[in-house]
Amino acid sequence: MIAMARILAIYRVLLDGSISSDEAIQRIRKELEDKGFKLEGYDENPIGFGIVALNLKITAPEEDGITDAISSVLEELEGVSSVELDMVSRVG
């Protein structure tokens, strides 16, 4: 049996300050896992005025439209003001 290839996608997510970054990460992790994606790690970068940018490292099956699906999950979360895909790479 051939294993399906996976991708690593790095997203930059800006939080609007209405929830803490810890709470945002918990929600992001849960929503991604519910859709079959995995949050592998993240970096937190305070920008100022209560705005925080999160650089999320997410793995998912390599499928057509998968990055759009991940973006949709992230954009629908409370406290997220913007989502930007920075990079996609095949990981296996």
UniProtKB/Swiss-Prot annotation:
Keyword Protein biosynthesis: yes
Cross-referenced InterPro entries: eEF-1beta-like_sf, EF1B_bsu/dsu_GNE, Transl_elong_EF1B/ribsomal_bS6, Transl_elong_EF1B_B_arc
Keywords: Elongation factor, Protein biosynthesis
UniProt GO molecular function: translation elongation factor activity
PANTHER family to which the protein is assigned, alphabetical: ELONGATION FACTOR 1-BETA (PTHR39647:SF1)
Family per record: Belongs to the EF-1-beta/EF-1-delta family.
Protein name as it appears in the record: Elongation factor 1-beta
Organism: Korarchaeum cryptofilum (strain OPF8)
Gene that produces this protein: ef1b
